[in-house]
């Protein structure tokens, strides 16, 4: 029989902070549904059900837009790895359990909506996309070497990456339904960043030196979204060249996040602050 995990000191210290932020998160939610952002009237069966299989001529959006959407989708597909790391670093009980479950559900909604839109509108090859999904999820995500504080810092940075990526992507999309969907995802990412960033803020009061060191470590190691998707090297370059998300955007968001924590003047963090 599996042993029930026991919360450690930091997990218990942050429990009331998680509760307060969870209450705020739910009180300010703006519920949305994947099916509202999928133009099902554009859909048709694939060959398996007597219709047509996908071919490149069916794509109508610019390549940079579909490349960015596929990167975003594959990242959302791999959220199970992030969920596992959060549970292993903290606990799936009480307010922690409620938050991690809620965060996972909201992130999964992004994957559901994106895949339904892209498959129904035939903007991407569903077979090729599925191959990459399986490959990337099997590769997994591991962060067992991160401390608990580093894990929270990473998540704050990661969610800010998602928000910037989606905002820049939405700004370049002319198709209104997809633009609206990406905007909704961006707004969720902003809320997720706020949650994790608030936990880091509390850590700065609770264990300041460790937290500053964690911020420096994660800032130094952070890469562009999708850098670990081996099959999408060309898509990553296209997205960077289009100004949606690349090294310049990454550097700026790291600087902005550190500044938002009030740490721009910290000696060990000055190298990450621009301007």
Curated annotation (Swiss-Prot):
Fe cation 1 binds at residues 107, 110, 189. There is a cross-link at residue 145 (Isoglutamyl lysine isopeptide (Lys-Gln) (interchain with Q-Cter in protein Pup)). One of its GO terms (molecular function) is metal ion binding. The keyword DNA-binding does not apply. Binds 2 Fe(2+) ions per subunit. SUPFAM superfamilies: Ferritin-like (SSF47240). Coiled coil: none annotated. Its cofactor is Fe(2+). One of its GO terms (cellular component) is plasma membrane. Fe cation 2 binds at residues 107, 159, 189, 192. It holds the Pfam family FA_desaturase_2. The modification N-acetylalanine is found at residue 2. Keywords: Acetylation, Fatty acid biosynthesis, Fatty acid metabolism, Iron, Isopeptide bond, Lipid biosynthesis, Lipid metabolism, Metal-binding, Oxidoreductase, Ubl conjugation. GO terms for biological process: fatty acid biosynthetic process. Was identified as a high-confidence drug target. Belongs to the fatty acid desaturase type 2 family. PANTHER family: ACYL- ACYL-CARRIER-PROTEIN DESATURASE-RELATED (PTHR31155), STEAROYL-[ACYL-CARRIER-PROTEIN] 9-DESATURASE 7, CHLOROPLASTIC (PTHR31155:SF9). This is Putative acyl-[acyl-carrier-protein] desaturase DesA2. It comes from Mycobacterium tuberculosis (strain ATCC 25618 / H37Rv). The gene is desA2.
């Amino acid at each position: 029989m599996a042993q029930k995990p026991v919360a450690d000191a930091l997990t218990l210290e942050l429990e009331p902070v998680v509760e307060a932020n969870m209450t705020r998160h739910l009180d300010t939610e703006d519920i949305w549904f994947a099916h509202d952002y999928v133009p099902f009237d554009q859909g048709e069966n694939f060959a398996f059900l007597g219709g047509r299989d996908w071919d490149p001529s069916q794509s109508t959006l610019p390549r940079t837009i579909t490349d960015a959407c596929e990167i975003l989708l594959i990242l959302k597909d791999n959220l199970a790895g992030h969920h596992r790391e959060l549970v292993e670093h903290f606990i799936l009980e009480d307010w922690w359990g409620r938050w991690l479950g809620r965060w996972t559900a909201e992130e999964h909604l992004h994957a559901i909506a994106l895949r339904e839109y892209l498959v129904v509108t035939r903007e991407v090859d569903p077979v090729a996309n599925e191959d990459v999904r399986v490959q990337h999820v099997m590769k997994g995500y591991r962060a067992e070497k991160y401390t608990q504080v580093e894990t929270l810092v990473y998540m704050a940075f990661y969610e800010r990456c998602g928000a910037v990526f989606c905002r820049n992507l939405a700004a370049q999309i002319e198709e209104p339904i997809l633009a609206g969907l990406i905007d909704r995802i961006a707004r969720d990412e902003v809320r997720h960043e706020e949650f994790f960033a608030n936990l880091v803020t509390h850590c700065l009061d609770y264990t300041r030196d460790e937290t500053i060191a964690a911020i420096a470590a994660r800032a130094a190691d952070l890469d562009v979204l999708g850098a670990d998707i081996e099959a999408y090297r060309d898509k990553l370059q296209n997205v960077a060249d289009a100004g949606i998300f690349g090294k310049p955007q990454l550097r700026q968001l790291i600087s902005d996040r550190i500044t938002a924590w009030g740490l721009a003047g910290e000696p060990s963090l000055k190298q990450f602050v621009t301007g």
